[in-house]
């Protein structure tokens, strides 16, 4: 396992799902994790990981609010003196066919999935620049590349994440900061658990490795890009989809 010993990592949307998996893997790798979420369940997740030996603490943060993000960042800097890694994992879906989609459904997804990257990254980057080191890794998606019915809003944000990644890496590389993204494919989740078995089988049939992914799979994908060993990799979207859509 790559080591993150002594590093401070922010993981947004860490209360459950892929974010929870990233928190667990990063703690196993030795990082101290700030779990950000608007859900109070984040505290329970942090307590569980901490009880298993992880160095993790919960901050209730609204990533769309510059004030909320700024206060959380300053609290981390005051206590730990630095931020090495920012994982922009938090995201939402509001699926509906395009002609029936409301402006609220469109704007809410854009705000959380894309605009929040501006807020969090701009708050953290000055500290990374000062330290001469940093890793920013954001959540894209296979559907940002292949699209999906009823997800015009979501797909637009995830394609935007990859564009944001390619652009920002050109600005901050000279500061020792790399910027990358991870695009998960079909991942086991509370949503997939509620799907009919035939739908899951049809999805797995499209995945060459023969199974759906797990939060742990995603955690290791993020761990690689967050490691010092990945220091020459920047501006990419890592497609973690079992070969469902090779890039």
Give the predicted meaning of each segment.
Residues 174, 181, 204-229, 233, ...:
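C-terminal helical subdomain
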Residues 97-98, 105-110, 192, 203:
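Substrate-binding pocket helix/loop in short-chain dehydrogenase/reductase
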Residues 2-34:
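Canonical Rossmann dinucleotide-binding motif of NAD(H)/NADP(H)-dependent dehydrogenases/reductases
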Residues 3, 146-149, 223, 234-247:
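Short C-terminal tail/terminal secondary-structure segment
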Residues 121, 157, 165:
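Active-site helix of classical SDR
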Residues 126, 170-171, 231:
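Alpha-helical segment proximal to the catalytic Tyr-Lys
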Residues 141:
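Residue(s) in the substrate-gating loop at a strand-loop-helix junction
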């Amino acid at each position: 396992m790559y080591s993150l010993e002594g590093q401070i990592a922010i993981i947004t949307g860490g209360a459950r799902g892929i974010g929870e998996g990233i928190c667990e893997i990063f703690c196993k790798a030795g990082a101290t994790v700030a779990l950000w979420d608007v859900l109070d369940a984040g505290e329970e997740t942090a307590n569980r990981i901490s009880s298993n030996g992880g160095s993790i603490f919960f901050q209730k943060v609204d990533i769309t609010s510059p004030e909320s993000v700024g206060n959380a960042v300053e609290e981390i800097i005051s206590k730990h003196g630095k931020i090495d890694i920012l994982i922009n994992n938090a995201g939402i879906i509001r699926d509906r066919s395009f002609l029936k989609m409301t402006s609220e459904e469109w704007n809410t997804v854009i705000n959380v999935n894309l605009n929040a990257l501006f807020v969090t990254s701009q708050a953290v980057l000055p500290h990374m620049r000062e330290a001469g080191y940093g890793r920013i890794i954001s959540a894209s998606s296979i559907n940002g590349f292949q699209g999906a019915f009823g997800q015009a809003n979501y797909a637009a944000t995830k394609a935007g994440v990859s564009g944001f990644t390619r652009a920002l890496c050109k600005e901050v590389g000279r500061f020792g900061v790399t910027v990358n993204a991870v695009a998960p494919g079909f991942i086991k989740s509370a949503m997939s658990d509620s799907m009919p078995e035939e739908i899951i089988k049809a999805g797995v049939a499209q995945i060459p490795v023969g199974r759906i992914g797990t939060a742990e799979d995603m955690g290791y994908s993020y761990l690689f890009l967050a490691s010092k060993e990945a220091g020459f990799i920047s501006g990419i979207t890592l497609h973690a989809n079992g070969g469902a859509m090779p890039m």
